[in-house]
């Protein structure tokens, strides 16, 4: 059985992320979507929310699991008996960073391969950062995220706007 691990912050999970998960699920026996705590970032959604959102969107895939992790990816991949790390590349600008990370992961996990996947054409431009910004400004994000994610975004953006108004 070959297990692939797809790590990311998924803040929020977009249609582009789901596209990669769907395609990876067709290639591997098991795909673990590894939602990172992201210590170096200030996430819009907390870890529990991001895991719940991912489970809502991806729960219908029988060979996909969603889990959170907060330590080294190396340790998480070992715990999951992972053989492959899946990474998405939207543009050449992503490649340099991802190439360096793949090299480091190869050093730390010599038995694990990194598989770079490019998004389907209609998702190449989608990023969680842009989706969050559009949502915070009250824009329509329905083409970029699933309806359940859109509801999460709208509720969180509204709560943040209301909080800002009272401060």
Swiss-Prot record:
The record marks 17 as: Transition state stabilizer. Pfam families: CTP_transf_like. Substrate binds at residues 9, 41, 73, 87. Its cofactor is Mg(2+). InterPro entries: Cyt_trans-like, PPAT, Rossmann-like_a/b/a_fold. One of its GO terms (molecular function) is pantetheine-phosphate adenylyltransferase activity. Its EC number is 2.7.7.3. The keyword Lipoprotein does not apply. GO terms for cellular component: cytoplasm. CDD domains: PPAT. It catalyses: (R)-4'-phosphopantetheine + ATP + H(+) = 3'-dephospho-CoA + diphosphate. Keywords: ATP-binding, Coenzyme A biosynthesis, Cytoplasm, Magnesium, Nucleotide-binding, Nucleotidyltransferase, Transferase. It is an enzyme of class 2 (transferase). Homohexamer. Reversibly transfers an adenylyl group from ATP to 4'-phosphopantetheine, yielding dephospho-CoA (dPCoA) and pyrophosphate. This is Phosphopantetheine adenylyltransferase. The lineage of its organism: Bacteria, Pseudomonadati, Pseudomonadota, Betaproteobacteria, Burkholderiales.
């Amino acid at each position: 059985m070959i297990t692939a691990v797809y790590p990311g912050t998924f803040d929020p999970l977009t249609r582009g992320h789901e596209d990669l998960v769907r395609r990876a699920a067709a290639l591997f026996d098991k795909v673990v979507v590894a939602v990172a705590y992201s210590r170096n970032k200030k996430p819009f959604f907390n870890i529990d929310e991001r895991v719940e959102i991912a489970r809502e969107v991806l729960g219908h895939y029988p060979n996909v699991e969603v889990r959170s992790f907060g330590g080294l990816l190396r340790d998480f991949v070992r715990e999951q008996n992972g053989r492959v790390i899946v990474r998405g590349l939207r543009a050449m600008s992503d490649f340099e960073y991802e190439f360096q990370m793949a090299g480091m992961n190869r050093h730390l996990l010599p038995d694990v391969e990194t598989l770079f996947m490019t998004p389907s054409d209609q998702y190449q431009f989608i990023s969680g950062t842009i989706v969050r910004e559009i949502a915070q400004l009250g824009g329509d994000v329905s083409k970029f995220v699933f309806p359940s994610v859109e509801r999460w975004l709208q509720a969180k953006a509204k709560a943040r706007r209301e909080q800002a108004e009272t401060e």
